[in-house]
Amino acid sequence: MQENTRLRIAIQKSGRLSKESIELLSECGVKMHIHEQSLIAFSTNLPIDILRVRDDDIPGLIFDGVVDLGIIGENVLEENELERQSLGENPSYKLLKKLDFGYCRLSLALPQENKFQNLKDFEGLRIATSYPQLLKRFMKENGINYKNCMLTGSVEVAPRANLADAICDLVSSGATLQANNLKEVKVIYESRACLIQKENALSKEKQALVDKIMLRVAGVMQARESKYIMLHAPKEKLDKIQALLPGVERPTILPLAHDEKNVALHMVSKENLFWETMEALKEEGASSILVLPIEKMLK
């Protein structure tokens, strides 16, 4: 019965989302001990169990109501949703928040020597992919007939191995494509990590915990996007200096001891401060400019 009273969160056991999912939960105050071979981690300060599973399994665990929350890439989520729909099912879930990591794109790629003018160049080609449903939807929307070559891994080697004419695979930097003499020619899907919840209603206690976690997730993400700025500014240039700073709220202006001409300005900036902005601040007379990271933030 204990497991039914604890919030169950599914995350990727290993792979590109695993580390950042754990970091997000930790920054939200979820204390846990992760053992490499363990499939379940128990929070020591909150009634939360972390299930570490294959990313392909997370959507199904949410659709079937086995776990309460899941952190998953949009590409995997939508691929699994389309697969269920193709079987006549109607999978459902709640999208709680798009997260600030796991960015990638699903793209069509051809051998470097192939010329590419438009999507019609894929007509009749055999395309290797691990995302057959997303590829099928895109090709259908664009009226392209093709032959599917389903692979669960190492998709990029398919053209060299004469398994396929082209590929449809995830791309982050493009280095893997270049290493396999391929070129990216068309992005068909943009993806990032997201936090989802099962459709069935949670108990009052679990929902209260989810609400608390969501507030913390928002705070963590806002803190990551923000910087705390401190500087000294001439009173006569204060308006110009403030105009250079993209703030979340109005700044705090403080007097400086034994200085009638300058004040201290403290504020939270909603954007990273680039060197060009700092140089512009300096030109307007600002001095002692400090830009600090923010660990936690609640509005």
From Swiss-Prot:
InterPro entries linked to this entry: ATP-PRT_HisG_long, ATP_PRibTrfase_cat, ATP_PRibTrfase_CS, ATP_PRibTrfase_HisG, HisG_C, N-reg_PII-like_a/b, N-reg_PII/ATP_PRibTrfase_C
One Gene Ontology cellular component annotation held by this UniProt entry: cytoplasm
Biological processes, Gene Ontology terms: L-histidine biosynthetic process
SUPFAM superfamilies: GlnB-like, Periplasmic binding protein-like II
Pathway(s) annotated for this protein in UniProt: Amino-acid biosynthesis; L-histidine biosynthesis; L-histidine from 5-phospho-alpha-D-ribose 1-diphosphate: step 1/9
EC code(s) of this entry: 2.4.2.17
Cellular localization per UniProt: Cytoplasm
Cofactor field: Mg(2+)
Domain of life: Bacteria
Recorded GO MF terms: ATP binding; ATP phosphoribosyltransferase activity; magnesium ion binding
Protein task: Catalyzes the condensation of ATP and 5-phosphoribose 1-diphosphate to form N'-(5'-phosphoribosyl)-ATP (PR-ATP). Has a crucial role in the pathway because the rate of histidine biosynthesis seems to be controlled primarily by regulation of HisG enzymatic activity.
PANTHER family, alphabetized: ATP PHOSPHORIBOSYLTRANSFERASE, ATP PHOSPHORIBOSYLTRANSFERASE ATP-PRTASE
NCBIfam families: hisG, HisG_C-term
Designated name of the protein: ATP phosphoribosyltransferase
Protein species of origin: Campylobacter jejuni subsp. jejuni serotype O:6 (strain 81116 / NCTC 11828)
Gene assigned in the entry: hisG
